[in-house]
Swiss-Prot record:
Pathways involved: Amino-acid biosynthesis; L-histidine biosynthesis; L-histidine from 5-phospho-alpha-D-ribose 1-diphosphate: step 5/9
Reactions catalysed: 5-[(5-phospho-1-deoxy-D-ribulos-1-ylimino)methylamino]-1-(5-phospho-beta-D-ribosyl)imidazole-4-carboxamide + L-glutamine = D-erythro-1-(imidazol-4-yl)glycerol 3-phosphate + 5-amino-1-(5-phospho-beta-D-ribosyl)imidazole-4-carboxamide + L-glutamate + H(+); L-glutamine + H2O = L-glutamate + NH4(+)
Keyword annotations of the record: Amino-acid biosynthesis, Cytoplasm, Glutamine amidotransferase, Histidine biosynthesis, Hydrolase, Lyase
The name this protein goes by in its record: Imidazole glycerol phosphate synthase subunit HisH
InterPro entries: Class_I_gatase-like, GATASE, Imidazole-glycPsynth_HisH
Pfam family, one: GATase
Gene Ontology cellular component terms for the protein in this record: cytoplasm
Entry EC number(s): 4.3.2.10, 3.5.1.2
Length: 209
């Protein structure tokens, strides 16, 4: 069972539809016990970083997500949800994030239209489980005005938008997509299927303990 975190700022409906399409069992929840009982977690998000962190704090979900992230349970952040995984953001004000990944969220300063919205090529950097069946140079769908300034060793996919935008990051059990896999057609569905596979592998490992 995958828990989709509902904190009032997520693209919940589209993520739900995507998981339903790939046949993944899921629950939409903000209940701490349900999240801890899940086999994997998706943190979606659309909107402002500081407001999102305030809401997560109010719901006592900061602690929950940090515990999930520091365990071996698979966690996938999408768009703003990915950005929240980092140490802090410069959006509106300096604001601390979940600190599960090293790096800072900075505003895009490019000679192009902001937000970066639409399809862009994703170049793979290294191999991870979520790349199974995903071709290098596939196109994915973005909507964002901020990007992750983070160490190269956690970057597994990049797109060019005047700067090199980390499109996909990963460290251990933690994954983050700056783009929207649930809106990225067959390629996005393949990535979510791969995440489902990672979740199932983790679940099986727990049953054998």
């Amino acid at each position: 069972m995958i828990a989709i975190i509902d904190y009032g700022m997520g693209n919940i409906r589209s993520v739900e539809q995507a998981l339903k399409y790939i046949g993944a069992a899921y629950i939409v929840t903000s209940d701490k016990e349900e999240i801890f009982r899940s086999d994997g977690v998706i943190l979606p998000g659309v909107g402002a970083f500081p407001k999102a962190m305030d809401i997560l704090e109010e719901k006592d979900l900061v602690r929950v997500l940090q515990e999930i992230g520091r365990s071996r349970k698979p966690l996938l952040g999408i768009c703003l949800g990915m950005q929240l995984l980092f140490e802090k953001s410069e959006e509106l004000q300096d604001c601390n994030g979940l600190s599960l990944l090293p790096g800072v969220i900075r505003k895009l300063k490019v000679p192009y239209k902001i937000p970066h919205m639409g399809w862009n090529e994703l170049k793979k950097e290294g191999e991870i489980a979520l790349w199974n069946g995903v071709e290098d140079g596939s196109f994915v769908y973005y909507v964002h005005s901020y990007y992750a300034d983070c160490p190269n060793e956690i970057v597994y996919g990049v797109s060019d938008y005047g700067v090199e935008v980390p499109g996909f990051v990963a460290k251990g059990n933690i994954y983050g997509a700056q783009f929207h896999p649930e809106k990225s057609g067959d390629i996005g569905m393949q990535m979510l299927k791969n995440f489902k596979g990672v979740v199932e592998t983790w679940k099986s490992s727990q049953l054998s303990i």
